[in-house]
Amino acid sequence: MAKVSLFNSKGENIGPIDLKDEVFAIEPNFDVIWRYVDMQLTNARAGTASTKTRGEVSGGGRKPWIQKHTGRARQGSIRAPHWRHGGVAHGPKPRVYFKRLNKKMKRLALKSALSLRLKEGNLIVVDEIKFKRPKTKDLREVLKNLGLENQKVLVVLPKKVEEYVNVKISGRNIPGVKVIIADNPGVDRTNIDGLNVYDILNHDKLVLLQGTVQKIEEVLG
């Protein structure tokens, strides 16, 4: 089994922890990672961009001047695309952006992203982070103790309880830091709500609590 150091919130190394090879130590499949991120970003698009064609712009129903004998170029409508205030040629219209992946590829993409972070040495496991009340200063102190100050950090918490929600709120005002809760595994048992490939790759460091590791291994192992 893969091993990684386990830290406490003071930044002290309290010993190694075993990680399942089938989740954290596979050979990253970059093709599947790309497909998953492409699906995420595509499905996040609103698809509401809209422009008017020359037939939809108000006005322009008559010919602006006669065809011949004016010395000017012939024109058919003041709402043609090359006119100021004219319609848009080949512009966007509202549409649905949607892509999907099968369960096997979703699981592989997530395990590949986790394995990549471990392979790079950018995965940190912490025994526990809990706050009685939201306080940005406290989370800054924890990240500083872990040597993660002024870095892009993704912190993944195991479940939605008050002490963890307070940690999530505490991270809102720290630039580059995102805190998510990996709660309620999906009904197809192939993913963890909140934990996704794009966020893992979009942050330089991945911080998992010991409870988060257990949940990930339970779902993906």
Curated annotation (Swiss-Prot):
Organism: Thermosipho africanus (strain TCF52B)
UniProt keywords, alphabetically: Ribonucleoprotein, Ribosomal protein, RNA-binding, rRNA-binding
A single GO molecular function term of this UniProt record: rRNA binding
Any single Pfam family the record assigns to this protein: Ribosomal_L4
Presence of keyword RNA-binding: yes
Chain spans, region Disordered: 48-77
Name of the featured protein: Large ribosomal subunit protein uL4
Gene3D superfamilies documented for this protein: 3.40.1370.10
One of the GO biological process terms: translation
Function (record text): One of the primary rRNA binding proteins, this protein initially binds near the 5'-end of the 23S rRNA. It is important during the early stages of 50S assembly. It makes multiple contacts with different domains of the 23S rRNA in the assembled 50S subunit and ribosome.
Domain of life where this protein originates: Bacteria
InterPro entries: Ribosomal_uL4, Ribosomal_uL4-like, Ribosomal_uL4_dom_sf
Disulfide bonds: none
Family in the record: Belongs to the universal ribosomal protein uL4 family.
One GO CC term on file: ribosome
Keyword Transport in record: no
Subunit structure: Part of the 50S ribosomal subunit.
